Amino acid sequence: MPVSSKVIDGAILAARHSFMPNHLGYCGPENNDVLFDSCISNKRSEQLVEALRGFQAAYPYLRFIAESLGAEDSLDYRAAEAYWIGNDFLQKISPGDFYDHLKARFKSKFPKEYIKKLFEAQTFAPFPHHALHVFNAFSTMGTVPDSFASGEGPDDTVGGLMDKCRISWGRVLEADEKGNLIVEYEPVRRLKGKLYLGTPAPTKVQAQFQGKSFVEGAKMGDWVSFHWGFACTILTPTQVANLRKFTLSDMTLANAVPVPQ
């Protein structure tokens, strides 16, 4: 039976974007089969909710966003979409509340002056979006290489790792016989310590795992999100625009406020 690419539940959206880094051992509990099976069935379960609660980086953001929206469910679709892709709800969240959240959560990892500067930067206000976690060094909570978390190392190495870790968007050019998609996307690049989106280029994205896909039916011209090289979901034009908007916002902020060494 084909796997539906339509996501109607926040837990499924979160699972789709969490699956591959969890499979690679970078974040979350050892419940990868629960994530995969839930994505394939497109159904929420108590086992899935419990697995997602084990993501020490993502889940607190989801809970914070949901609480800010007045939602009792931390995996409310609006909260999951806000964090993983971006939507208008992010701009309704109190900057003061988010500042308090980051200060309390990361006080042992960064000096409070750094977090304060994020909110004082004359660029964009920080949003609880996945790209903020990637570009502003909060990924020290994961198990990615030290050069990524600290921002140290050659530009191409750090930029390449950030490119894999952020949620990318790509327009499908073709599909091959091995279950891969060739998409055109804007890669993250770093030059002299500054991040930017590079010239659109084709890249291969894995679209199947064990013969099944989260983006079943994706065709030429469709847009898909992908994370650590794996296709997560088919995007609407509005979602593409939001994902790009909040990615650029967080990238600009990262360039304006250097990570403390």
Predicted segments, located by residue:
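Beta-strand/loop nucleic-acid-binding surfaces
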Residues: 192-215
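Short, well-ordered loop/turn sites that connect or cap secondary structure elements
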Residues: 217-219
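Short peripheral tails and domain-boundary helices/loops at the edges of structured domains
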Residues: 239-261
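Short, Lys/Arg- and Gly-enriched loop/turn segments at beta-strand edges
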Residues: 229-242
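N-terminal intrinsically disordered, low-complexity, charge/repeat-rich segments that act as generic
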Residues: 1-156
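Structural detector for short beta-strands of small beta-barrel domains
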Residues: 160-178, 183
